[in-house]
């Protein structure tokens, strides 16, 4: 992890860097971070993460985040690209104090779309648990079996779209920002936002890798500005 100098109006930035260039089958990656009371931080990656084809074992990623009272945490990595044959198991566990705020995004691209690669074989599971004051606020499990075509190609799955993203805002006033995103995305398919319970806003996107990234960037700018009280722009690492 590197700590580049933030812009004058930004929170401290932590850059998560994989010096190996990617993850292979059998690799295990664990990250833990705690923000104390009233602290602010933005966590980003400097580039897309790559998960290579596996010869059998899963790649395992575990992220554990904790935010104390009045803390504001942004988890904003760039895309994770699953090469054909990759096997990724990922877990995210976030614990928030009563008035802590969280903005989190995760984007998955199935196959190296720039090389016209299709994700024909492989496995992906994504496990989210979000806690507020020790009580479960949100739980989500996504599992893509091997072979993945029956989910990726199905009309009630990804409908042959190669990319998907999740956006999470946990804040006491989360519902106030739903209509801002709906207005931004009102003429677009494959993008939706909802408030499943008080204090939680969820966005879901599917589409091409380019369209999904554009939608995530739009949401990040809106939510960083209005919900996280930050600058009206993307993190600098997203632009480098």
UniProtKB/Swiss-Prot annotation:
Top-level division of the source organism's lineage: Bacteria
Protein name: Urease accessory protein UreD
Subcellular location(s) per record: Cytoplasm
Entry-linked Pfam families: UreD
Alphabetically ordered keywords of this record: Chaperone, Cytoplasm, Nickel insertion
Gene Ontology annotations for the cellular component aspect, listed alphabetically: cytoplasm
Main localization of the protein described in the UniProt heading: cytoplasm
GO molecular function: nickel cation binding
PANTHER family linked: UREASE ACCESSORY PROTEIN D
Family stated for the protein in its record: Belongs to the UreD family.
Biological function: Required for maturation of urease via the functional incorporation of the urease nickel metallocenter.
Subunit description: UreD, UreF and UreG form a complex that acts as a GTP-hydrolysis-dependent molecular chaperone, activating the urease apoprotein by helping to assemble the nickel containing metallocenter of UreC. The UreE protein probably delivers the nickel.
Organism: Granulibacter bethesdensis (strain ATCC BAA-1260 / CGDNIH1)
InterPro entries: UreD
């Amino acid at each position: 992890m590197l700590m580049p100098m933030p812009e004058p109006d930004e929170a401290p930035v932590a850059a998560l860097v994989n010096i190996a260039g990617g993850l292979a089958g059998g690799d295990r990656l664990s990250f833990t971070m705690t923000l104390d009371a009233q602290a602010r931080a933005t966590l980003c990656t400097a580039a897309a993460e790559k998960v290579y084809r596996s010869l059998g074992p899963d790649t395992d990623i575990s992220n554990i985040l904790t935010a104390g009272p009045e803390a504001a945490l942004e988890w904003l990595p760039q895309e994770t690209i699953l090469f054909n044959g990759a096997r990724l198991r990922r877990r995210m566990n976030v614990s928030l104090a009563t008035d802590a705020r969280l903005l989190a995004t995760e984007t998955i691209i199935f196959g190296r779309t720039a090389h016209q690669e299709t994700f024909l074989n492989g496995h992906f599971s994504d496990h989210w648990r979000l806690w507020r004051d020790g009580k479960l606020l949100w739980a989500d499990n996504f599992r893509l079996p091997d072979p993945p075509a029956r989910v990726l190609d199905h009309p009630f799955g990804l409908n042959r779209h190669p990319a998907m993203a999740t956006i999470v805002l946990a804040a006491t006033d989360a519902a106030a920002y739903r209509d801002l995103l709906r207005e931004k995305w009102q003429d677009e398919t494959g993008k939706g936002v909802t408030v499943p319970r008080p204090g939680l806003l969820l966005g879901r996107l599917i589409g091409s890798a380019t369209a999904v990234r554009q939608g995530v960037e739009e949401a990040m700018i809106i939510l960083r500005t209005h919900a996280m009280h930050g600058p009206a722009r993307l993190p600098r690492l997203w632009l480098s």
